[in-house]
């Protein structure tokens, strides 16, 4: 019965999203990412309803497929409650618990998943006419999904998480800049700046997330790499700008 209910909510939300043209998220997440230490019994994510009407909230975790539904997601974590009604100006705590098979995840590096929160607003009430009949006009309704990163972090990783950005390796490779992550953690960079004619130019069109023990490269604007910096996003979602040292 629960399976059918969850599937129904997801289907209705998709229909609403397809026909909608505008919308505003009333459900606000208190965090831009979730870190799950492998030895934790559970971790919590707080959310609140900043709107003036109740919202139906559905939450689930996927392994990177943005099109996956709650019933298709195959991950070793569960969220309680998966569906909840959040009253206006009230909050809700989502409790995330690892299943026993989470121990089968790689214990030598972080794993990344995505946490989804679907905000399904109520149907607007029809207007009453003078004869007390309810006028039900056509309306557009939008279900808004928030999606944030969810990191599973093995406790066996002993590196200092606060100095991760200092371990990034930067190498000029012709007209490109090679970026190496020699750590077992995911590193998220929101901007890479190159100074040109005393103006900072962001070389990233969108953020860059480096997987553990991986590398990537971007194209430089010119050969001048003497004044470059980057913005690193830490565990708390804070953005920290640092000088690139070659």
Language model features: what each stretch is:
Residues 10-20:
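Bacterial N-terminal signal peptides
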Residues 69-102, 198-225:
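Intrinsically disordered, low-complexity Pro/Gly/Ser/Thr-rich segments with frequent PxxP/GP/PP motifs
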Residues 25-48, 159-172:
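Beta-sheet-dominated interaction scaffolds and their linkers
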Residues 63-73, 191-196:
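Short, basic/aromatic beta-hairpin or loop at an interaction surface
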Residues 47-51, 177-183:
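Asparagine-centered strand-capping/turn motif at beta-strand->loop junctions
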Residues 101-155, 225-246:
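Terminal connector regions
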Residues 53-61, 180, 187-192:
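Short, hydrophobic/aromatic beta-strand segments
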Residues 1-12:
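Bacterial N-terminal signal peptides that target proteins for export
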